[in-house]
């Protein structure tokens, strides 16, 4: 997939959640979220928004090894291009924090209203049926 990417984020192993939380922090701070979708379809948004405070760009850069400006660029690209989809492979889930990775990806999709619409959502890519 890398040859087709406009931006390739080379993060440290195990830093997926921090990267996604940092992207969501940017989206909230810059008002790129889908407020109507959140109001109609999401619960506990205020608590979620509060949890993002721990993921400022400097902290995310330190945790992930990804330059802050790349995190911001990824967040803006994802939020500004509708519909957006998240595709992931088995490596995303095959770790002690795999469930947290999927939850964070789903939260990113919901934050931007990129779920339940054609060409959107959170989509695992597997080599066999029902692998996920």
Where are these regions (language model features)?
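Cofactor-pocket helix-loop regions in the catalytic cores of large enzyme subunits
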Residues: 1-130
């Amino acid at each position: 997939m890398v040859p087709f990417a406009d931006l390739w984020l080379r993060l440290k192993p195990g830093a997926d959640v921090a990267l996604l939380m940092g992207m969501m922090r940017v989206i909230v701070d810059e008002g790129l979220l889908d407020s109507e979708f959140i109001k109609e379809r999401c619960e506990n948004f205020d608590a979620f928004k509060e949890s993002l405070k721990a993921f400022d760009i400097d902290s995310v850069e330190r945790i992930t090894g990804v330059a802050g400006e790349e995190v911001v660029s990824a967040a803006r690209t994802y939020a500004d291009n509708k519909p957006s989809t998240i595709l992931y492979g088995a490596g995303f889930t095959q770790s002690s924090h795999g469930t947290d990775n999927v939850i964070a990806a789903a939260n990113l999709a919901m934050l931007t209203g990129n779920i339940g619409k054609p060409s959107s959502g959170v989509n695992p890519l597997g080599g066999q049926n029902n692998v996920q």
